[in-house]
């Protein structure tokens, strides 16, 4: 069956020592007085169940996951029979709509052309009681693959190929002007196994904690300027993989996504030094004070220069993606890894088919050097010549999408999730299936009243 990898975590990953520290895994799971809200939320989502139609062509097929504020379904396009994922959330979502934020991030990332390592946003809609989005249906995420196939850790040849792809995916996000801020194994997934064009591609997903780190430069068309770093930020992300700066409450930059990538790869390959520690402050001190050789002792030594490099960067600096990839490439060469070799979970038939598409399309991740040198943002210093008052309305130019995307061409929150109130949702009509089952409400949810400007 199809597995949705931008699934809803049902348990919190963050420390219980402080209610102000939130992981992205709270985006549906964490509710205020859930006992009092359950019934209301269920009413908000009652239309969204197998058999219901969206836009008169997407039919809900099966439930893939659910949490306190929303559900995820597999949906099928009844015109071309393609499958996708539906994520629907109650408007009672604490901290505001995660779907609005994800919509904004995905539109920015894909505005200059489809990016292979990022799910496509196919459609979004805002209703009176719920918001929903239809996105690319992916395969299993890296966390689930480890649990099923490699409980003692990924074999090095597979692990290093995953490492390179994850770096490419993160840089794609950075090149769009966004930070992900919740890098972890559950937020990366291989493509849908039924789609040979995507099956071997690792995708980055779940942008509910993302943040724009640049603004349009009003003095130069097509250029950007950095947002001024805030003096303090609340904890967000997932404590196991959060960067050292996050434990200090410091503003995050591109380097912090790479720190989280290092910790994520450490977790996939072996284990984290703080695996059995549940004290957030103690974990932060370990990340900040351990020498690189000690911190990276379970990883190939070729990767030690990565953390040494990261410690030299401030919040505005651009990471040296080429240096990082060179470290990965040394491991790739040392252990004679190959992009041609099948993955353990691929059948022989699927491996042959997927390889043919991989070689035919010349996937960028097999030779990422030129891409990693590109720097469309061109920011490596702080905004000394700009006033911090200019940062009140962050924007990076993007084409506003209000229509569905052809399927042939996918989503986490905190107490202070970046404001989504000005981000528009899709405007296409939501039309229920004619002659639908009695279990599906006969009347579709009504549109909310649009606020006056």
Predicted regions and their residues:
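Juxta-kinase regulatory segment immediately upstream of eukaryotic protein kinase catalytic domains
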Residues: 8, 20, 24-53, 61
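Conserved N-lobe ATP-binding subsite of Hanks-type protein kinase domains
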Residues: 71
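ATP-binding glycine-rich loop module of kinase domains
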Residues: 77-101
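Short beta-strand micro-motifs within the conserved protein kinase catalytic domain, predominantly
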Residues: 120-131
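Catalytic-loop of the protein kinase fold
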Residues: 174-192, 196
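Activation segment/activation loop of eukaryotic-type protein kinase catalytic domains
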Residues: 189-236
């Amino acid at each position: 069956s199809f597995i949705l990898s931008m699934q809803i975590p049902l348990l919190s990953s963050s420390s219980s020592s402080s209610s102000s520290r939130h992981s992205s895994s709270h985006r549906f799971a964490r509710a205020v007085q859930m006992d009092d809200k359950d019934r209301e939320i269920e009413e908000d989502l009652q239309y969204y169940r197998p058999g219901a139609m969206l836009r008169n062509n997407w039919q809900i097929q099966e439930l893939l996951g659910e949490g306190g504020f929303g559900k995820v379904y597999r949906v099928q396009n009844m015109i071309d029979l393609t499958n996708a994922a539906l994520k629907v959330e109650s408007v009672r979502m604490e901290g505001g709509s995660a779907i609005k934020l994800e919509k904004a991030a995905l539109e920015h990332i894909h505005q200059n052309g489809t990016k292979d390592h990022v799910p496509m946003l196919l459609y979004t809609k805002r209703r009176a009681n719920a918001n929903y989005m239809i996105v690319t249906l992916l395969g299993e995420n890296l966390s689930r693959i480890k649990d099923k196939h490699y409980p003692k850790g990924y074999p090095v040849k597979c692990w290093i190929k995953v490492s390179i792809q994850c770096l490419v995916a993160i840089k794609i996000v950075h090149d769009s002007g966004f930070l992900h801020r919740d890098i972890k194994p559950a937020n990366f997934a291989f493509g849908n196994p039924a789609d040979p064009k995507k099956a071997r591609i690792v995708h980055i997903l779940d942008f509910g904690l993302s943040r724009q780190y640049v603004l349009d430069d009003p003095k130069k068309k097509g250029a950007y300027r950095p947002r001024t770093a805030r003096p303090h930020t609340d904890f967000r992300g997932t404590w196991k993989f959060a960067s050292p700066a996050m434990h200090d409450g410091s503003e995050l930059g591109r380097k912090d996504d790479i720190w989280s990538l290092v910790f994520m790869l450490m977790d996939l390959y072996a284990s984290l030094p703080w695996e059995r520690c549940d004290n957030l402050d103690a974990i932060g001190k370990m990340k900040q004070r351990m020498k690189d050789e000690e911190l990276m002792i379970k990883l190939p030594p070729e990767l030690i220069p990565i953390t040494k490099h990261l410690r030299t960067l401030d919040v505005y600096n651009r990471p040296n993606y080429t240096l990082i990839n060179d470290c990965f490439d040394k491991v790739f060469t040392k252990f004679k890894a190959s992009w041609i070799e099948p993955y353990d979970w691929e059948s022989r038939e699927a491996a042959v088919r997927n390889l043919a598409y991989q070689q035919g399309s010349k996937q960028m991740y097999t030779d990422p050097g030129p891409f990693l040198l590109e720097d469309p943002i061109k920011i490596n210093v702080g905004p000394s010549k700009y006033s911090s008052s200019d940062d009140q309305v962050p924007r990076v130019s993007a084409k506003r999408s209000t229509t569905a995307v052809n399927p042939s061409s996918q989503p986490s929150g905190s107490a202070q999730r970046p404001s989504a109130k000005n981000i528009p949702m899709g405007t296409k009509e939501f039309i229920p299936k004619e002659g639908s089952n009695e279990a599906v409400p006969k009347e579709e949810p009504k549109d909310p009243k649009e606020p006056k400007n």
